[in-house]
Amino acid sequence: MSRKKLPIGIQTFAKIREGDDYYYVDKTGFALQLIEQGTHYFLSRPRRFGKSLFLDTLAELFAGNEPLFRGLQVHDRWDWSRRHPVLRISFGGGVIRDAQDLEGKIAELLTINEQALGIACTQRENRARFGELIRQAHAAGGERVVVLVDEYDKPILDNLTRPEIAREIRDGLRNLYSVIKDSDAHVRFAMLSGVSKFSKVSLFSGLNNLDDISVDSRYSALCGYTETDVDAVFAPELPGLDRDEIRAWYNGYNWTGEAVYNPFDLLLLFQKREFRPYWFETGTPTFLVDLLTERRAFTPALEQVMATDALLSAFEVGDISTEALMFQAGYLTIGQVQRIGAQPRYRLRYPNLEVKASLNEALLLRYLPEPASVMRQTGQLYDLLLANDFPGLQTLFTAFFASIPHDWYRNNPIARYEGYYASVFYSHFAALGLDVRLEDATSHGRIDMTVLFNGHVYLFEFKVVELTPAGQALQQLKDKGYADKYRARGEPIHLLGVEFSRDSRSVVGFVVESLG
């Protein structure tokens, strides 16, 4: 198989398919399944995951552009004699600042669709004009209309820090989307996609026939690349790259079905031949980091979150749950599904090394007063671990906490809660991309933190001396026999008891015992 062009940043199906110059992962089987099994859909996926390309694929399919689909799954199962008018609405371009901006953008999008379909609407108010456009498009060709809405939520997300403006924009969008329900007799298929999942009550009032496929095992791999896709489609790009490292860095997103790789990351990896957090770097989650800091999130607990459907959907202007934001934005994914009665509960986790390391690094930069020192200290931490220099580790962390100015503690609420010290400790290790396991279960209890690195096992127990007597951290590791779980590995095991003082804001105990 010869190498092809990498479709980096291309959201146009025709551009990828014309000439067969680009790699293409065939998603048309999913398109056919959706069309055969329903009519109105909603899909939430993180940014840069291929939502726009999938909607464009649907548009070309309904428009009957048969040459583009030759050799694909859908080709021999589609009636190419029928062509449906397609209305395309995308809020991906630019930033909408207020409700007036929104109305102007909607008017512009409706004009573009009128011109594309050769229709001149007489109504001028946007809601009425949208309805007229759907009716006229149906009447003109005799086939019912397809409505595709991309980045349906971006105008709201761009204004989350201004709740009143965000609510006005939400109401304007709800007014627009309600037309789809009112025009049901003229609509063959409709799909709305975006990053967030606002409730039907707040944004899709009346669209009660909207099938949410965001967390659906059948469509878990609708966006993104599967293991099979990587090995089959991108085989010419794999030589020279460690397959296990690719998997660790970029695989792991799951919506209760088949796991997928982040497509944006993979394409840039194949282009640049270097492992980097490409997806994370394209959109620093300032809003998320601010929220986690403000809510004093205990960072070690972020990869142990249990959530229900209701919690994952708790995304409203001015009332956003931490779990919903992290899940919908792509910083957490579903690791396991448990059922309690008829209700599913989801254990969330970081999807991969890229997200875990990069998010913890971003949090460290917020937790600490001198961002430049963070990079220096994480580098020192790696070298000290490599050498098993435990006195050096103690010196590093003791000096680190001691170097934080008292004014910063006084002015930063995050430093006044007990979990702050363990959070900073954990985030240093996680930011290095090490195999860090939290609340590691054994038959005797749970280890606070386990780090597996360079053929060694490190077991950590954290204590706050104002809450427990000094010396208890290491003793608990020994009394509970936590090392037993890892003895079969035949690797050196190190027990580390770390004690913090809330009053003195420092590491006051750091005791290590190494086992053969």
From Swiss-Prot:
UniProt-listed Pfam families: AAA-ATPase_like (PF09820), PDDEXK_9 (PF08011)
Classification via InterPro entries: AAA-ATPase-like_dom, PDDEXK_9
Top-rank taxon: Bacteria
Protein name: Uncharacterized protein in vnfD 5'region
Source organism of the structure: Azotobacter chroococcum mcd 1
